[in-house]
Amino acid sequence: INTFHPKNMAKELHQLYGELSKEDLVEKNIQGISIAGRIVLRRVMGNASFATLRDSSGDIQIYVTKNNIEESIYDDFKTWDLGDIVGVSGSLFRTKTDELTIEVSDLEMITKSLRPMPEKFKGLTDIEARYRQRYLDLMTNSETKEIFIKRSKIVDSARSKMNERGYLEVETPMMHPLAGGAVARPFVTKHNALGRDLYLRIAPELYLKRLLVGGFDKVYEINRSFRNEGLSTKHNPEFTMMEWYEAYTTMQNQIDLTKEIILNAAKSINCDEKIIWDDMKIDLRSFSQKKLSDLVLIYNKELNEKDLDDRSALEKYLKGLGKKTDKNWGTGRFLLEIFEETVEGKLINPTFVTEYPVEVSPLSRRNPDNPQYADRFELFIGGREFANGFCELNDPDDQASRFEDQATAKDSGDKEAMDYDKDYIIALEHGMPPAVGVGLGIDRLVMLLTNQSSIRDVLLFPQLKN
């Protein structure tokens, strides 16, 4: 039974009394302080001892002496170990070294630690152990804890921005009858009662757009998605996305909102707009906007504008880059492959890339001026994709045709191709207003703003190999 109820936190005590001098503390005679925390440091010196307690907010020193507590309790205290969770009560004073300290008048053991702390509490330095035993990492590395505090603030800032703009937060299914909403390989599970396969969602897109059909004009969701792909410093099989849809808006409005969300997130954790990420200097004030085809020509001087419509020329060029090709690819897929190979990694400052080929944008509306391209954008920062958005395809016949193309690709062995979603086509036949949707990777945004090079460092419990 828990009988100790702390009234104070370490950070609070430092904030309230950290500026008071030794004389001020004596004059104010601040009694009734009580705090609970883990012993992270201790120095036993006969009849008096010092220890450092760590709670969820920070550290504070305590001073325990036989003069203030029962001798038997003090003798017990001398046998307590690093890692034990204790509760103390007392008054505040400053030591000769000017450290704010609790002079203990009462203390009790709350939880006994049966295992020793790693590295004598200097921190868990083995990277693999930090991920597998995150509780020890959080316990010993204040920098790790700060990352996840910042992550929470970043998510909160994004949610606040969407609510401020009148969006409705919703929750859509995590298990789907069909794999759709993005081009990726899904996880498959079986529902025993229904006797059928279900797929962990790779994106919430098709359900969120059903809500547009139903009459919600502004919706968003912050939640997990799953992709059955490789593990790396950039990818985890489950990850957090914020995806939103707005009817009757423009792609440019949503580009501007995406930028606003990112800058607001940086502000929420007091992050400078000029940052270092993975040894790259990035200026968050320097957003630019360029067409994908223009970027391909800029970074591939051997290609000219005519080559962009020449399948054989693009295939030859891609093979020259040492990349494998597929006979089922059209010019759009070749163009995207060349972009990913030669351009993507060079987009260091924030860059919105627009006008993707329709062939690789199965859910995007065609550009009315150039139908082989879609009204779509992706945001790249530090050579990595952060967001993907487009004017939503609301023509059921065009969408059905693209689903058929995806189904053909799947039959030809493309494990990432989407299924034909008949129910979604029926929804579109009821009429979906013109809309723009955007997906923003939360994990990658946290990596950027906290200067972490691995996605595992911004996930509390990342997926690891055995």
Report each predicted region and the residues it spans.
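Class II aminoacyl-tRNA synthetase catalytic cores and aaRS-like
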Residues: I1-N466
